[in-house]
Amino acid sequence: PGYGFAKVPQEVKEHWHSLIEGYLSNRESLRLVVVLVDIRRKPQELDADMIWWVRQSRTPLLVLATKMDKMSRNQAFSALSKIRKTFALKPEECVAFSALDGRGVDEVWEVLNRAVTGAAER
């Protein structure tokens, strides 16, 4: 499950918080952070926190809205728009994705390629 659903004590979650923040702040070779969100769920506070940390680290970001195959094209478009608006994402920072039917795969590969080849410098 995602970090928001992990059944661990609050002190463990706080430890994760400091680990993630430290990693994002100190990992100079980090080229891209991909944050997975379920397109069917309303945007979560923990996702907003993660996106904020990534932005503070000035690392390129991709929010991958997963499970788009679980909704109609119109529903997916509307949900993706809400995610972009809620998190103030540029269009290229948020991609709808389905591992089941492959939608969004080409866009993800483009972003990953730009990140690892240096086209998306900090």
Describe each PLM feature range:
Residues 1-11, 113-122:
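Conserved G1/Walker A P-loop phosphate-binding module
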Residues 2-5, 40-43, 67-72, 100-103:
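Conserved nucleotide-binding/hydrolysis micro-motifs of P-loop NTPases
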Residues 2-4, 15, 23, 29, ...:
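Residue-level preference for alpha-helix termini and adjacent loops
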Residues 8, 12, 97-100:
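Pocket-edge positions in alpha/beta enzyme catalytic cores
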Residues 9-40, 51-64:
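Inter-motif core of Ras-like GTPase G domains
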Residues 35, 49-63, 87-89, 113-122:
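Short, Lys/Arg-enriched charge-dense amphipathic segments
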Residues 42-58, 71, 76-83:
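Conserved catalytic-core segment of NTP-binding enzymes
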Residues 69-122:
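Canonical P-loop GTPase G-domain recognition
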